[in-house]
């Protein structure tokens, strides 16, 4: 019987299934960070339980760490407590951790794949909604709650119910200047933030297969923003080439054995999906979100939508509220929207490919950040990404143009550290969420690709990067 990739991954990890469909699922890898793990570790201590499989866990601090000078530690007492608590818990339980001073430290969804800790065929969980990122490797990956983090630490299993299968098929060739970020924003714009609810979402088609692993991670990262439980891409040579030789990846004979299995991790010909969504890559344009939800997105060629043209009263009210919060008027050209700050980073777009794309735009335009842009910052996803970018001279390109070159961390993706928007400030951001207050109380977020963000920083407003050549 032909199986989908999701079916294969699920079936390979079922320990037991109850009559109501509740399944005990084996977990191969748990990633931990400082925000959702303290209560889980405390629960283990109170119950006097050990970590069941220490080697299956990998930890890093990312949400609360400063991205400026770290020589004086963390100034904010709450952030410091969370980071110190993770350090102490990992030391106590013997869990491998990349501490703040380790060059391997970075955003959890960047360092996992970077280290080869995320592998095809795995079940991967983390107390973070964007764990779907790891599905790019032909893995079943999704976020879990704090009580579930404790459950996995104690048992290496998770209670779950199976999702339905969805295929998002993107065929054709992307126009020059368009990226994986534009693909996934276009998908969310098409199906909405509830379009994937109840589904595990597989991304396929020639445009997806043409993406690098960095691009595939960007797409899977935002599957959760379409409402899906997980996002995934089948394994191919691009997957294997990325993994080979990484620290946690198998070596020698074990590598050959693993590859033999990994090559089966794709949906079979004729596999049945409960729902299929199709897009043509050549129809995708550089995307810019205008509202307070990732589904509120249009292309750089468009104008801010007019609520009066929306027949659904619920959607119309949501649009009106979003426009009020974003301080935008209907029918304004997207290219006329001026910005105050630029953030290039996050678990969506902080890998070396993203750094290169942004630096290329900066070089192409050959100017400094616009006078109306108060701050433009580039935050690499890990210390290793930062090192690689510096070897290539990308940091010099950014700094010469007036960008700040920062230390790795979640940074301005969310207002949980020193990097945030002030009320009323408008930001071109390569992150994944544009909710009210996401980047700071009263802050206004526009989601874009790294290239679009870099161009906006230099021009002071959104521009069409396709016109750069």
Curated annotation (Swiss-Prot):
Residues bound to [4Fe-4S] cluster are 347, 410, 413
- Is Nucleus one of the keywords? no
The cysteines joined by S-S bonds are none
- Biological or metabolic pathway of the protein: Amino-acid biosynthesis; L-leucine biosynthesis; L-leucine from 3-methyl-2-oxobutanoate: step 2/4
Q: Which InterPro entries match?
A: 3-IsopropMal_deHydase_lsu, Acnase/IPM_dHydase_lsu_aba_1/3, Acoase/IPM_deHydtase_lsu_aba, Aconitase_4Fe-4S_BS, Aconitase_4Fe-4S_dom, IPM_dehydratase_rel_enz, IPMI_cat
Single biological process term from Gene Ontology: L-leucine biosynthetic process
Task: Could you list this entry's UniProt keywords, alphabetically sorted.
Answer: 4Fe-4S, Amino-acid biosynthesis, Branched-chain amino acid biosynthesis, Iron, Iron-sulfur, Leucine biosynthesis, Lyase, Metal-binding
Query: Which enzyme class?
Result: lyase
Q: In Gene Ontology terms, what is one molecular function of this protein?
A: 3-isopropylmalate dehydratase activity
Catalytic activity line of the entry? (2R,3S)-3-isopropylmalate = (2S)-2-isopropylmalate
Instruction: Name a Pfam family for this protein.
Output: Aconitase
Among PROSITE patterns, the record links this protein to: ACONITASE_1 (PS00450), ACONITASE_2 (PS01244)
Its EC number(s)? 4.2.1.33
Q: Which cofactor does it need?
A: [4Fe-4S] cluster
Give the cofactor note text: Binds 1 [4Fe-4S] cluster per subunit.
Q: Which domain of life is it from?
A: Bacteria
State the similarity comment. Answer: Belongs to the aconitase/IPM isomerase family. LeuC type 1 subfamily.
Q: How does it assemble?
A: Heterodimer of LeuC and LeuD.
Q: What does this protein do?
A: Catalyzes the isomerization between 2-isopropylmalate and 3-isopropylmalate, via the formation of 2-isopropylmaleate.
Query: What name is this protein filed under?
Result: 3-isopropylmalate dehydratase large subunit
Q: Which organism is it from?
A: Ralstonia nicotianae (strain ATCC BAA-1114 / GMI1000) (Ralstonia solanacearum)
């Amino acid at each position: 019987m032909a199986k989908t990739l999701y079916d294969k991954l699920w079936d390979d990890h079922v320990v037991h299934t109850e009559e109501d469909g509740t399944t005990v699922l084996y977990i191969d890898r748990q990633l931990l960070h400082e925000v959702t793990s303290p209560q889980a570790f405390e629960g283990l201590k109170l119950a006097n339980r050990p970590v069941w499989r220490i080697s299956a866990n990998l930890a890093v601090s990312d949400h609360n760490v400063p991205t400026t000078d770290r020589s004086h530690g963390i100034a904010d007492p709450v952030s410091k407590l969370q980071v110190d608590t993770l350090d102490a818990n990992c030391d106590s339980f013997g869990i491998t951790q990349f501490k703040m001073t380790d060059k391997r430290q970075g955003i959890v969804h960047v360092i996992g794949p970077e280290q080869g800790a995320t592998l095809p065929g795995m079940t991967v969980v983390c107390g973070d909604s964007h764990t779907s990122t790891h599905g790019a490797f032909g893995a079943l990956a999704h976020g879990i709650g704090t009580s579930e983090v404790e459950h996995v630490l104690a048992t290496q299993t998770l209670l779950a119910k199976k999702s339905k299968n969805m295929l998002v098929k993107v065929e054709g060739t992307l126009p020059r200047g368009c990226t994986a970020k534009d693909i996934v924003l276009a998908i969310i714009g098409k199906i909405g933030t509830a379009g994937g609810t109840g589904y595990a979402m597989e991304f396929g088609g020639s445009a997806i297969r043409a993406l690098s692993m960095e691009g595939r991670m960007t797409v899977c990262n935002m599957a959760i923003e379409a409402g899906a439980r997980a996002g995934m891409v089948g394994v191919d040579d691009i997957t294997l080439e990325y993994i080979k030789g990484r620290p946690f990846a198998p070596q020698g004979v074990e590598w050959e054995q693993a590859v033999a299995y990994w090559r089966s991790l794709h949906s079979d010909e004729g596999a049945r999906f409960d729902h299929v969504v199709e897009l043509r890559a050549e129809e995708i344009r550089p995307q810019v979100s205008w509202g307070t939800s990732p589904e509120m997105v249009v292309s750089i060629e468009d104008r801010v939508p007019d609520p009066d043209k929306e027949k659904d009263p619920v959607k119309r009210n949501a649009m009106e509220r979003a426009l009020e919060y974003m301080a935008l008027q209907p029918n304004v050209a997207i290219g006329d929207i001026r910005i105050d700050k630029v953030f290039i980073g996050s678990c969506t777009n902080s890998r070396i490919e993203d750094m290169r794309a942004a630096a290329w735009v900066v070089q192409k335009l050959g100017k400094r950040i616009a006078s109306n842009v108060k701050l433009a910052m580039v935050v690499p996803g890990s210390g290793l990404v930062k090192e690689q970018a510096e070897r290539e001279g990308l940091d010099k390109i950014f700094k010469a143009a007036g960008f700040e070159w920062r230390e790795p961390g979640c940074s301005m993706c969310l207002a949980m550290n020193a990097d945030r928007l002030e009320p009323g400030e408008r930001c071109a951001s390569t992150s994944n969420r544009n909710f009210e207050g996401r980047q700071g109380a009263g802050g206004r977020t526009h989601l874009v690709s790294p290239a679009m963000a870099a161009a906006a920083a230099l021009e002071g407003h959104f521009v069409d990067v396709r016109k750069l050549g």
